[in-house]
Regions:
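Active-site and adjacent substrate-binding regions of carbohydrate-active enzymes
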Residues: 1-179
Length: 179
């Protein structure tokens, strides 16, 4: 049975990380850049690389089938170790994941990623949970989220990267400032 999965855009197929040949080609890409002197890598939505079974279960929006999947830690560990980038800076963008899972990805003893970043703090001004419909930010909630994530990551020996926005978000000055 064949299918075409595209979580973000119909022109961007999700790679089948269950296929060992795909994983080997991704390792070759990393080796290519490493040989040219790159000192680190940012992995986009890396926690979505392992998919669960979709068989006849259509409840919800489907995130539980493609977020933090059954082989994600195995695949990241393999990628990092087989390419020799264990000591490089590696940061993974995390979509729809939890503090506990971010700790797993970045805990130094697990030897997966050096740091992660997630978007929980950027939802404090979403109107009706919609990214492009904004309201005044809830600064108390923002402060609480930062505090909980920083203390939680520290306690779990993880490391999260702090940021205000990226290409997936409305401009920061439009949200938290005055143009």
């Amino acid at each position: 049975k064949k299918w075409y999965l595209c979580l973000f855009d119909k022109t961007q197929a999700d790679l089948n990380w269950d296929n060992p040949h795909v994983r080997e080609e991704l390792k070759n890409v990393i080796r290519f850049w490493k040989e040219r002197g790159i000192k680190g890598f940012r992995f986009d939505v890396i926690n979505l690389i392992s998919k669960g079974s979709y068989d006849n279960d259509y409840e919800g929006d489907g995130r539980r089938y493609y977020t933090d999947g059954p082989h994600v830690h195995e695949y990241i560990h393999e990628l990092v170790h087989d390419t020799g980038i264990k000591d490089m800076i590696t940061v993974g963008e995390m979509s729809s994941t939890s503090l506990e899972d971010c700790i797993k990805y970045s805990n130094r003893e697990r030897e997966e990623l050096k740091m992660t970043f997630s978007f929980h703090h950027l939802k404090v001004d979403y109107k009706d949970n919609k990214k492009w419909e904004l309201m005044d930010p809830d600064y108390k909630k923002l402060k609480e989220l930062f505090k909980n994530w920083q203390l939680g990551m520290q306690a779990g020996h993880g490391w999260n990267a702090l940021f205000w926005c990226n290409h997936d978000q409305p401009r920061i000055v439009s949200r938290f400032g005055d143009e």
